[in-house]
């Protein structure tokens, strides 16, 4: 009978390097994507509502900036676009602040593609929009 020696050590090392490490990186990358995607939607809804109540997009900008800071994001990692303006170009659209008007905001949040313990690699902008109507019977004075 021949002496058969196994290759379990080599197979284990290859399995960890080829299968486990990429799977772990994929799982770790899902958390920030999910968190920041939810942040974009919530920031869009809250900032649009704040702008409608205060009749000012500046108030909406402040609400979104505060939410960004609460999540520990750099201010450059979130951008807003009001009433059709592109967030990437400054986002200062003109929103009509009259009864029955619709105020729309688009929020973009930077999401890293891969998150490792040593830092983030790559990234994409996740975008969410929300529209809020100004009440027809509200006092504007």
Region spans (language model):
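Alpha-helical assembly-interface signal, strongest on the long, hydrophobic N-terminal helix that forms
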Residues: 1-65
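Short, conserved structural patches
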Residues: 53-141
């Amino acid at each position: 009978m021949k002496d058969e020696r196994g290759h379990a050590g080599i197979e284990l090392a290859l399995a960890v390097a080829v299968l486990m490490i990429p799977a772990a990186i994929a799982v770790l990358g899902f958390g920030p994507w999910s968190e920041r995607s939810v942040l974009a939607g919530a920031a869009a809804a809250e900032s649009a509502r704040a702008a409608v109540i205060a009749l000012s997009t500046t108030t909406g900008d402040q609400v979104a900036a505060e939410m960004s800071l609460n999540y520990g994001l750099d201010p450059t990692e979130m951008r807003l676009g009001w009433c059709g303006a592109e967030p990437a170009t400054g986002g200062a659209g003109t929103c009509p602040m009259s009864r029955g008007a619709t105020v729309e905001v688009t929020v973009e949040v930077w999401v890293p593609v891969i998150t490792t313990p040593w830092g983030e690699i790559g990234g994409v902008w996740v975008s969410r929009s929300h529209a809020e109507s100004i009440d027809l019977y509200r006092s504007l004075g």
